[in-house]
């Protein structure tokens, strides 16, 4: 074989090797990109949707991702939409929303988001399997309403957000007026898996529930007549906290098996009735109070200005409401309901349902009255 032919063979082999390496790298890049925009299925909590069509500043990976978990039930879907809209509008951070729903709500939610100015947000829709709650909750005949499975989604944050080290959970009855990055950057003390806003803080006045006493200490949530509660040596006068908004250190949550601890107390309550009947409907707060007793950090009180839903009257000045970083309509008077306080603030962020399935009750009433 001539020297020229040898050179040609070597050149062909070199080109083939180059193409092989290039092909291998391309496959690796494709795999990496697929991993960036999808998660594998999880038994019980199934991610079914992910929208990566956000501005490049969000998806290029140079900013830390801020996971925000919100539960969205069909009958309260407008609340979740308003909350998400307020968060997205008031930040330039890399936020991804984990929206937890039950079967049947995903299509409605997806349609709502895709038909509004929220169509470019990053989000995942996660179906919550109610079988997770079997043996852990039971219907109380004295309660006027049935159990709401999605209220327990907050107990399963490490499963909902499997890759995150930190996350924010918030209820659907909130409006965020500050930059969510500030809440995400809440410092947590070593060994603490979560940071809550305590009910005794200076900005959220103590709420007196008719016939129920004060909703700001442990005795309002736990039955101190039960031996199992007394043997925990928790002071009944300890200030409670509100679990409707909190920041979680998921690494610490996993290390301490917080979810398993919460499930333990849920099961014990089913067997022994450990929760106080003083505050009707408080079925998610008691196990959290037990597990996080003197083992939680605190968030800035302005990041959970609550009790806006405790009555239809206005308890705060307009100046204070405007200064709040997060407004929380916890209580029976929801901002999408028949009567509520500060509805003008909430409606600023509400996006009408393009399908017409969800509508504001008070508007419905107003229209009926004009006929």
UniProtKB/Swiss-Prot annotation:
Residues listed as glycosylation sites in the UniProt record: 103, 257
Could you give one GO CC term from the UniProt record?
A: membrane
Listed A to Z, the keywords are: Glycoprotein, Glycosyltransferase, Membrane, Signal-anchor, Transferase, Transmembrane, Transmembrane helix
Domain of life where this protein originates: Eukaryota
Q: Where in the cell is it found?
A: Membrane
Q: How does it sit in the membrane?
A: Single-pass type II membrane protein
Q: Which stretches face the Cytoplasmic side?
A: 1-7
**Sorted alphabetically, which CDD domains does this protein's record hold?**
GT8_like_1
- Report the EC number(s), separated by commas if there are several: 2.4.1.-
Give the family from UniProt: Belongs to the glycosyltransferase 8 family.
Organism from which the protein derives: Bos taurus (Bovine)
- What's the gene? GLT8D1
Transmembrane stretches in the record are 8-28
Residues on Lumenal side: 29-371
- A Gene Ontology molecular function term of the record: UDP-glycosyltransferase activity
Q: Name one Pfam family in it.
A: Glyco_transf_8
Q: By what name is this protein known? A: Glycosyltransferase 8 domain-containing protein 1
